[in-house]
Swiss-Prot record:
Family, similarity comment: Belongs to the complex I subunit 4L family.
Uppermost EC category: translocase
Primary location: mitochondrion
UniProt protein name: NADH-ubiquinone oxidoreductase chain 4L
Membrane topology: Multi-pass membrane protein
One Gene Ontology term from the biological process aspect of the record: ATP synthesis coupled electron transport
Transmembrane segments: 1-21, 29-49, 61-81
UniProt subunit comment: Core subunit of respiratory chain NADH dehydrogenase (Complex I) which is composed of 45 different subunits.
Encoding gene (name): MT-ND4L
Keyword hit for Protein transport: no
GO molecular function terms noted in the UniProt entry: NADH dehydrogenase (ubiquinone) activity
Amino acid sequence: MPFIYINVLLAYFMSLLGLLIYRSHLMSSLLCLEGMMLSLFIMATLMTLNMHLTLMYMMPIVLLVFAACEAAVGLALLVLISNLYGLDYVQNLNLLQC
């Protein structure tokens, strides 16, 4: 396995570990999710280019579009929650009150 794949997998697992450790704040959770999506995008791009799969050239672009939509929705929720409650603690949010 080439060294760059190991680096991308390490970045993914570090973001996953950060998501598990820093899950109390919504902002840190969103940053860790963005790190995971970025490493998935890099891995999909590398795999597509190295395997010369012409039918899969659109997959990294679609993944990047979904990551942008996820970031926009996450930031909108962060702004809404911080305006309503004044903080971004995840444990203070009750989904049954929405």
